[in-house]
UniProtKB/Swiss-Prot annotation:
Activity across pH: Optimum pH is 7.0 for the reduction reaction and 8.5 for the oxidation reaction.
Subunit structure and binding partners: Homodimer.
EC class: oxidoreductase
UniProt keyword annotation of NADP present: yes
Superkingdom per UniProt: Bacteria
Protein name: Succinate-semialdehyde dehydrogenase (acetylating)
A Pfam family of this chain: Aldedh
Amino acid sequence: MSNEVSIKELIEKAKVAQKKLEAYSQEQVDVLVKALGKVVYDNAEMFAKEAVEETEMGVYEDKVAKCHLKSGAIWNHIKDKKTVGIIKEEPERALVYVAKPKGVVAATTPITNPVVTPMCNAMAAIKGRNTIIVAPHPKAKKVSAHTVELMNAELKKLGAPENIIQIVEAPSREAAKELMESADVVIATGGAGRVKAAYSSGRPAYGVGPGNSQVIVDKGYDYNKAAQDIITGRKYDNGIICSSEQSVIAPAEDYDKVIAAFVENGAFYVEDEETVEKFRSTLFKDGKINSKIIGKSVQIIADLAGVKVPEGTKVIVLKGKGAGEKDVLCKEKMCPVLVALKYDTFEEAVEIAMANYMYEGAGHTAGIHSDNDENIRYAGTVLPISRLVVNQPATTAGGSFNNGFNPTTTLGCGSWGRNSISENLTYEHLINVSRIGYFNKEAKVPSYEEIWG
């Protein structure tokens, strides 16, 4: 069967199922959405094992934690939200808001997150009474298919319409392209090629941009805590989280203290240029990331570079030779490796981060470890980012119980990253909202003198 026929059939089935799902009440919808998250929560260990084995990326324990945290955080965030019928009324404006589904959602998912991304997108889609078709990464299709299979098994127990979640069984660029061109709305999480294809599909699309989180350590902050938080984020799942830390920008006068804090907390620091170059040439080939190091452990990366590191090393920190295009290490490194850079003034720290974003990753995420709110707000105002994560691992930009970012696996990067949104994607992006506007007898109509005076 050709991709054309199979995609066409998936779309037709999804449309039929969507019309049935559209008749569901809020209570019925929420029962289904909760079940999807609970399936991943309950099977976290199995899914984590399958993901590591198939993709050969990441860390089993971190993938278990990710399944638990994301499923719980997403359900906790959306469980009380209205998405069916009248969702809000504003008597003072004489407006009534009515939620309606967008239809069939096409969702491409990355090799780096083959379980939680399908779950997240399915929960958001069905919360809005949409159906969804997942286009998995070809090298993660088995675990993604198993995730969809178990979610569907749970939906069947609940008597849900058949085919509200489907998956492309033979994923390819051609199949993904056709799917995106046939759906009502597209979520593109993955490489730049897929995101570009989504925005070229002729359909409303939500894509993501490349990560390259710059992290500023403010002078006088608790360097030990900063090191702990940054290492926690950088080593998580062997560094494949899109918002995880990439560069540490530290005060020059306390640089040695900052590095000492990193070493004390399990980092291996490299400052001699010859050894740094061994890692540089291992991580990047012709200016592009070496696919062989993505999601690999510190030990594997060190072995590839021909460098011995102490057993138990959590991350590798390399001394950079300059910001932006001066050093390819200032690009995104999807493994537990950081580049360290010095600054004299806080304004210079922000300039260094800016140079690195102009090199790669504009619009995504930054981190700052500081007690100075003026500096925090300055960085948040000046940098071309959608999220500034304060005094916590940058990996929490995707939402956690300790911050206000909406929990998601799709992080919009705004126009900087050539995306349509500069926030975390949620169910709200997958509903249409109609507005009923009554004649407002109580409205005060200002005179032109009042307006222009």
